[in-house]
Amino acid sequence: MKVSVIIPVYNGKSYIKQSINSALNQTFKDVEVIVIDDFSNDGTYEYVLNEFGNVGKVKIFRNEKNMERSYSRNFGFNVSSGEYIFFLDYDDEWKANYIEETIENFNNFDIVYSIPRTFIDKNGNVLRVSKRKYSKDINELVFSAQIAYPSATAFKREKFIYFNENYNQREDWELFIRAVLSGLKINVIDNNKVMIREHDKRTSGGLSFLNNTLKVYFDYKNKIPKNYLPFFLFHVSETLLRYGKLKDGWLLLLKAIKLNPRILLNSRRIGSILKRGFRVRI
């Protein structure tokens, strides 16, 4: 098998079919799809069995208890056989030639990340296509958490590093930080092949997001290369400001600016400070 697509899911009955189909309907056909149900209680496991149980390319597993998505992704890797490992969240989708183009861009790289620009709603309608500009410096992108979506991430099998199961959010960012610090080579491509679904149940917010961001901070603040530390600190500071932790947020922000004043020569960062630090509507 050339490619393994690993899809962790918890209570994702509403979207899992679209996700699996977007993996099965790729122009690249030598694919196995591994679904790991994390002890859902909404009938997701039974639904996937009914819809895909007779599809040879789809392998369906169920955790004996809720183990969180890092465990599920790691388990999926352990039972996979592909030369290339792709991850897809249960609520996201890919355009039809995503896998094909990703494999073409591996070359001597260990990880290929495809910048997601299309965001869809619960019905699959396009909400927006991002025109955000990204730095060409891969390390800057990683340490400032501008790349992290698992659905946009693919590994060569022999270079895969396990997700940290001590994190129940920000595990994707933490993994990329480890990847850079361990010397893995990352290719970032901007081809708009990954579609991120926005909906009420998406777990990219809440207090857990803040707490796990702070966990990354304390785990890695002394390991980040000096020239990239301001970008790391800025991201943590804007997260603190976002959640109303103004004193701590401003202290960290000022530290980042002191280390590298040029970090403010970026309209997005200025906008973030105005919005979160001063509560200005922009």
Task: Give the role of each language-model region.
Residues 22, 37-46, 65, 89:
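A conserved acidic beta->alpha catalytic loop
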Residues 63-80:
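Glycine-rich, basic loop-to-helix element that forms the pyrophosphate-binding segment
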